[in-house]
Amino acid sequence: MPSFDIVSEVDLQEARNGVDNAVREVESRFDFRGVEATIELNDANKTIKVLSESDFQVNQLLDILRAKLLKRGIEGASLDVPDEFVHSGKTWYVEAKLKQGIESAVQKKIVKLIKDSKLKVQAQIQGEEIRVTGKSRDDLQSVMALVRGDDLGQPFQFKNFRD
């Protein structure tokens, strides 16, 4: 019986490469000359810290970071950025978390979406992923298109496709 898994993962190596590319661009940009502006990836916490001297510059750094991550294949929706920036002394910073795994509320929405579609497939929650099984490969591909088309605030990957 054909099946596949719906997961939401961020490749940390690609995230590190995107952060390095963003740092390289910031170092060469004229508007960041003589300004304390850094972007750091913390592998242990899976967070990216963006620090600068003003909140406007933090927004610019976030835009640069999102563009570089997108070029590396990491969607902007996989970055959880708080609305408020932290002001400490003369610097502003924000710690953005990389979304790893699918939260239980989003999992339930996906399962409900699949069941409401009336396709002949089964969806089961397994930890931080969802296993979808069905009799025909076409139904599974329809589920993939359905999940991709619905905006659930998080990018999804499809793994372990088996016939």
UniProtKB/Swiss-Prot annotation:
Top-level taxon of the source organism: Bacteria
Cross-referenced SUPFAM superfamilies: YajQ-like (SSF89963)
Keyword annotations from UniProtKB, A to Z: Nucleotide-binding
Molecular function via GO: nucleotide binding
InterPro entries: DUF520, UPF0234-like_C, UPF0234_N, YajQ-like_sf
Function recorded in the entry: Nucleotide-binding protein.
Family: Belongs to the YajQ family.
Record protein name field: Nucleotide-binding protein YajQ
Species: Salmonella typhi
